């Protein structure tokens, strides 16, 4: 769903620190480039720790950039391996079938229960996978072969189990040809386990910066954006909008985790240097095991930004660190301009944290996104905010199979950034590349075919284009505003139900090409 309809229920209510979780989870689940599944439990712990911190901690407690050590990062000098050098192994392919793994977070795991308790589409993931795989198989399959879907439910908080699954898929039985991660819950080092170590193709919605695909190349392909060109776009927009400039004091708050440090040092800082900007950088502990340190670091970062006269802030934080940082801004009643983005899903997560409890910190903030945020969940014309062609095709197939409302919902439409369209899009993408690879399907022919896909109708993003050295799909970005629709206005598109949206993303600037990567 594009927005929360729970505004009235929270008007006049006392602050409850867990209140925003249900709303925010309906946005966080979309990326993946997002760490949303792992973060379900993390944020609950953060809230408890944050309350204690805000009540008990004195100002100026040690923390911040001096106490949060950066994890080892991948070098930006790492070069991508071209598809032409991929393995020619056909492991997982027989004369009649292609074994493909579909990892799905187990609904009976605590992470699944907490993370998706209010997301009714989440319960439809396995039926959706079967539906879209069967659609391909019933139409003749892939050059005479049928996809054999191996749906594996797992607990994303159990790292040892995920490592064991990776080894089973890439080395054990049954042999697996590829892994498809529709919603982006198979992330970070687990991606590299499958691709770099296991030399097994992985299509995933979770993304970070170029270094990751370089390490996983030529087997790692993202339906989300590479964050290197996205951060470049963020800086360009920041300058053009007046949020960044030599006369504007800029702060960057970044976690100590390897992908975030990599994004800062290898991409964001060089982008800022090109336009003559030197930011004040504050580091916040980002580990799920460092909740107390994260809270104190966030508090101190805000204190230092405030004392230095910072006017704009770029967050490079996972949800478990972004949440305490915004809470610290609110506690200190200091509200700078935030430059949000798809990086760690800050533009998506922000909508879930208004109007309660962080409206002052987040309402009206803007950012860049490659996603189709700002639309509506129905089949009205695309020009009026309805589905893009890729999502519309997914909806048509789903509605023919499931003409009634999804259980627990009132309407039969699928979510524009929800899990059904995400699985539909990536399954179709895989099938296209596998067909283009021809009868001699192996790892090399598959990734070579992936590298030749252009202008493919995307789902989370309007189109996907790949290349021999372009391992991510999105090609465009837009600027959107996080908007609390109170009083009700036409800024938020009216659903067909006639019930106005409580919050929404409002398009500020239409889609334009992403800067070239590298």
Regions found by a protein language model. Name each.
Residues 21-47:
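N-terminal export and membrane-targeting signals
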Residues 123, 138-217, 223, 286-296, ...:
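Beta-alpha junction/loop-to-helix N-cap segments that form part of ligand/metal-binding clefts
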Residues 224, 329-423, 508-514:
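Extracellular/periplasmic periplasmic-binding protein-like sensory domains
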